[in-house]
């Protein structure tokens, strides 16, 4: 083992989208509205829990296995919190809530049907679309966020959770320490596009992330560096799986 490897610590991160809501079913833009899980979503949570259990117990080499989950960190919006509570294998484990994992605030577009938003709020919709390439451009309306606003808070939250796991020295540098992050589709898509290196071996991976899908990534931390922004690397291993066997969940 060379010196660089000795200083490298790895934490696996499960990237999970919340279960289906009534707003999802109706095609209404949620943003940071605190919406509830619907009946379909409750069934999705049951399947998610079974898939997480399979990842922890299966001996099938084709499954993205995890030894155990050390931390569960979730957006504090109830659709994510309820999903996190329902997927828990160990009921005694604490769930950490964070507003930093919330969906992007899209200003006046929140609560508007996606099909009619371009007609009802043409300027706001145009700004939202333009902001996908102009990362510093905020959505129109009070509270509207830019892509950079979202990336900044999400990165802070996940890297803080990773560092706390490493500081607790739970799994040494074996790569077996795992945390689960329960968040939103918009957050996951931005994370994937801007923060991670991909290692997906050519699998189809573009598109919408379905509810209760699971992605996996590794966060590598160079413990020899004190520069927090330069000593981490995010590597995406799988994206938006609906089941532990790895059926693609991307449209």
Predicted region positions:
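Short, active-site-adjacent cap segments at secondary-structure transitions
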Residues: 22, 79-81, 103-104, 187-189
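Short beta-strand scaffold positions
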Residues: 74-75, 152, 182-183
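Acidic, low-complexity terminal tails and accessory targeting/binding regions
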Residues: 1-12, 104-118, 163-177, 190-251
């Amino acid at each position: 083992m060379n010196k660089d490897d000795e200083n490298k610590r790895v934490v696996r991160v499960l990237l999970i989208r919340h279960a289906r809501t009534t707003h999802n079913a109706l095609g209404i833009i949620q943003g940071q509205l605190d919406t509830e899980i619907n009946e379909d979503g409750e069934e999705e949570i049951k399947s998610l829990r079974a898939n997480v259990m399979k990842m922890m117990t299966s001996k099938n080499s084709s499954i993205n296995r995890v030894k155990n989950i050390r931390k569960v960190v979730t957006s504090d919006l109830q659709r994510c919190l309820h999903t996190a509570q329902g997927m828990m294998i160990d009921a005694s484990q604490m769930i950490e809530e964070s507003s930093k994992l919330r969906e992007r605030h899209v200003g006046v577009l929140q609560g508007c049907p996606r099909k009619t938003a371009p007609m009802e709020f043409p300027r706001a919709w145009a700004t939202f679309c333009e902001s996908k390439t102009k990362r510093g451009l905020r959505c129109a309306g009070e509270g509207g966020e830019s892509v950079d606003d979202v990336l900044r808070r999400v990165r802070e939250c996940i890297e803080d959770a990773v560092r706390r796991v490493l500081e607790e020295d739970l799994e040494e540098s074996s790569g077996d320490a795992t945390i689960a992050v329960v968040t939103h589709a918009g957050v996951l898509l931005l994370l994937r596009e801007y923060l991670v290196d991909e290692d997906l071996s050519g699998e189809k991976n573009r598109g919408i992330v379905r509810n209760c899908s699971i992605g996996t990534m590794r966060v590598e931390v160079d413990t020899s560096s004190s520069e927090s922004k330069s000593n981490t690397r995010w590597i995406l291993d799988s994206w938006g799986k609906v089941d532990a066997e790895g059926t693609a969940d991307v449209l």
